[in-house]
């Protein structure tokens, strides 16, 4: 796994400074101890978990590619018939390389990797990157999925806009698809928003610079750019997609640059 830390600014977080595993992770990701921080990182049952300190009843956030909802979706989620697979262009004999420019907790990236794509996740927030790294560590060690996870899922830490732009100017980078799922403000009242998502949003905030992602994504992707949006959201950067794949609450806006061929 390749991790590149392009973020020079430090981020304050509360953690047990006498726990070497957490201290090492925080040092690696530029996280500094802050006794008054809103969030805490803990390491329990071999899992790095984020807790919102002023809402202790809320479930902590961690990245788990081995069990739970993502494992169930991998086994029973519909395979290549899923909307995300159609949006990315997965079909018989075609396993596109994908850069997920807004990795978040890595769930969509994992779906694509489980279906055969080689996926590079880009995540700019150091706390989220630390959670992703820990999730990948456990997945890489898993007897069932470890082999293909090590081959297909990688993590890159840095600004999404800068990373996409830099990769687009590199002659060594070949990417079929860029996938984007920028954080969008929820229309519902906060009580209706999933508790985990509420904690996550309070950590990372809305992607106010999301419109700036489309141009470098289009420059990098050789085949298409896929943007996941809530059904009520406007087009990213005001640019109309080539086609739209709608789901119950979201849609995939697809910007086609070239045909997806084997």
From Swiss-Prot:
EC annotation from Swiss-Prot or TrEMBL: 2.1.1.242
Gene3D superfamilies according to UniProt: Vaccinia Virus protein VP39, YhiQ-like domain
Reaction(s) catalysed by this chain's protein: guanosine(1516) in 16S rRNA + S-adenosyl-L-methionine = N(2)-methylguanosine(1516) in 16S rRNA + S-adenosyl-L-homocysteine + H(+)
Compartment(s): Cytoplasm
Molecular-function GO terms, alphabetical: rRNA (guanine-N2-)-methyltransferase activity
Family annotation (InterPro entries): 16SrRNA_methylTrfase_J, SAM-dependent_MTases_sf
Keyword Acyltransferase: no
CDD domains: AdoMet_MTases
Record keywords: Cytoplasm, Methyltransferase, rRNA processing, S-adenosyl-L-methionine, Transferase
GO CC annotation: cytoplasm
Signal peptide from the UniProt entry: none
Pfam family, one: SAM_MT
PANTHER family xref list: RIBOSOMAL RNA SMALL SUBUNIT METHYLTRANSFERASE J
Similarity-based family: Belongs to the methyltransferase superfamily. RsmJ family.
Its job: Specifically methylates the guanosine in position 1516 of 16S rRNA.
Protein name: Ribosomal RNA small subunit methyltransferase J
Organism of derivation: Shewanella woodyi (strain ATCC 51908 / MS32)
